[in-house]
């Protein structure tokens, strides 16, 4: 492969998520964005409560009045006085530049919810422990390192949010807050979770994400009411078998740890719908995982797995997204075609797979995105033309030397990535892909482009960099929607006049065509052109001082010397990349 020169990555391709790592699209995060609202009781004070309704999948707001920047103008004493006089049950002092809480806070005995997000509090005063009715205490984004012991008096506390603080050790008092249902400790500096965590038997949501924890204690199995557990982005070296006792678990996030294996007991978590296993040290998966049939997104990217349990995929009846990237698969996952009947996204890039079996996607009527980039494929299966639901196909960085003519049946394709293969030509049937927006064939061995390319009227990005092209078809002028055209590092001797019809063209890369002696006058008709690269092109038909002046001067010269010198200057490329 040749090193590509004279190009810059465009945000257009990145936004399509073709060359990006797909793992993040399926990453799991426990829903700990804000404190969980407490149960609403019917009492005369209910009219003084402000409740927050959180829709599934929508990031909840911690407070009703959101302050985008810290406000030193807020008079905390007046807020507390007002709260006391009204007998309010909720106080929001979030993002108010608070450093010290006043002692009169203890007088707010009716308070049920206290929000102190985004302040500068380093020490929580013991007065907070004197709020007997407090159910929600939100302290995210402060400078706390510990908590006062008398918080143990908060016998009604259900939600404790300590995200984004400076806690190195979980304060002992937390292990005594036995009424907690929600505990968020993510983004701290915690290295140890003591066995006292087992005391919090009512916990439903626990987040320890982004800490420095190595060992998850076995008593985690005593938290039988857990619904979501997020211990991702730590240094966890084991998952205790007792995790199987948490039978109400629906979301378990273990990604970015050092876990070498999963216990068989994980198969008891039959309510689970989300399981995050990305970037661990897993070399295999237990057969019992097939019992977790409700999982809809299965992502094991970045492990050492070479094969899946035989019946696993067939058992995941709700599976819509499957990511097996960056493992050690040498063969396609075994199993009948029905295992993909609900799958819409299948990503298996960066493995060692040599073949996609015939008929494997016969039942995959919803499959819209297939990424098998960076494997060892030499061809595509004979039934390739039956993958008619595909919208995005990425087979880059393989050893494919020929595309099947049946590609004409993939009429829903919008993105086709074929870069870094061994293709010498494209089938004429490619002209049938009328919805295609991105066609990337960089670093192949193409000697020509079929004239049928003219039918790709929806095409916006065409990448032909680093091939063996001696010319471009005149029909390229029909591609009036193309904004990005890269034909650098080829063997072009000319550019067709019809390029002037590409009215949407914004970026044109002609760099490193060592036989390119001239440019057509029609380039001046590309009124949207902003960037043109002509680096390392001789362009001997033009005056050397003009070429040395760069693309802007070249365009001006073509305009003045050609038949279009009476036209209004609608745009001149300003840079040579």
From Swiss-Prot:
Any single GO BP term: intracellular signal transduction
Cross-referenced Gene3D superfamilies: Ribonuclease Inhibitor
Pfam families per record: LRR_14, LRR_8
GO molecular function per UniProt: volume-sensitive anion channel activity
InterPro entries linked: Leu-rich_rpt (IPR001611), Leu-rich_rpt_typical-subtyp (IPR003591), LRR_dom_sf (IPR032675), LRR_domain-containing (IPR050216), LRR_R13L4/SHOC2-like (IPR055414)
Residue stretches in coiled coil: none
Compositional bias per record (Basic and acidic residues), positions renumbered to this chain: 1-10, 33-48
Ranges for region Disordered: 1-71
Keyword Repeat: yes
Keywords: Leucine-rich repeat, Repeat
Domain of life: Eukaryota
Intervals holding LRR repeats: 87-109, 110-131, 133-155, 156-177, 179-201, 202-223, 225-246, 248-269, 271-292, 294-315, 318-339, 342-363, 366-387, 389-410, 412-434, 435-456, 458-479, 481-502, 504-526, 528-549
Function: Acts as a Ras effector and participates in MAPK pathway activation. Probably acts as a scaffolding protein in a protein phosphatase complex that specifically dephosphorylates Raf kinase and stimulate Raf activity at specialized signaling complexes upon Ras activation.
Recorded family membership: Belongs to the SHOC2 family.
PANTHER family the record matches: LEUCINE-RICH REPEAT-CONTAINING PROTEIN, PTHR48051
Protein name, UniProt field: Leucine-rich repeat protein soc-2 homolog
Organism (species): Nematostella vectensis
Source taxonomy: Eukaryota, Metazoa, Cnidaria, Anthozoa, Hexacorallia
